[in-house]
């Protein structure tokens, strides 16, 4: 792990060699038990503007299952330190951990809300092969995450966060809405505390990844660096690219990804021209008539998956139910 001084050195190098735009978001991700008050102050002085803490849960037993080393009591302390340093704050939560009850999840949500951070992320647990938890699930030592349980927990998160003044701008991300945000009509374009880093992915912007294992995406090209830090450093010393492999995306894949990512946001995506809406367009009926006369879009509205009023304005914006079934909505919009 890089310490504060090393992170500051990297940021200084980027500023001198490439340049950092005025007002740019510069986020530091940290485990609650690896940061200090002094380190957060130094990070802010170096140019970091935001810190995201991996809280995950407020329940000790769940943290143990997730192999997290911090205690629940540590999180409000480091959040307060970050605020005092002048950093925007965020916490990441995970739901669906084996053994987690709905009451456990509610306790974690209420704890996170009590810290009054600017931003909260709530991710469903992904059990990956090759991990300790993946092996435990495969052996039957831990139960497989239950989709219905995860849906109930997401609905609870949406309700509690909404009541507390947090607005969703991407399925897993909620931001504390300021007065200016509310006046703007809840467009994530204007959310002061929405993560620019997250939005870059959901809006299909280009990005460059630096460091071992980092991924980059520019236009139709996508590539990733070698994962081993020693191999990464050796390539740089030898004047070689650290890129290990890559791919060129065809137009169909790019369109699928644009829809799949864009539909996850509270801005939604334009319906016109999508494969699932072209039948009405080609018939000369226009999208509005297509919505009213049946077809995929009308079915999505009838099933309560996309907002009907937004669809009549030409945009697909997910309802709460639609957020739970976003992959299905994507397939329908793509005409699969």
Predicted regions and their residues:
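Mobile late-domain/C-terminal helix-loop "cap" segments
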Residues: 282, 290-294, 310
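Short, amphipathic alpha-helical interaction segments positioned at domain boundaries
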Residues: 320-336
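Short, Lys/Arg-rich nucleic-acid/phosphate-binding segment
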Residues: 172-174, 310-315
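Auxiliary N-terminal substrate/complex-recognition segments of SAM-dependent methyltransferases
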Residues: 2, 294-297, 327
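Short, hydrophobic-biased segments on the C-terminal half of alpha helices
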Residues: 11, 297-298
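Charged substrate- and nucleic-acid-binding regions of tRNA-handling and nucleotidyl-transfer enzymes
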Residues: 271, 298-300
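A short, conserved structural fragment
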Residues: 301-313
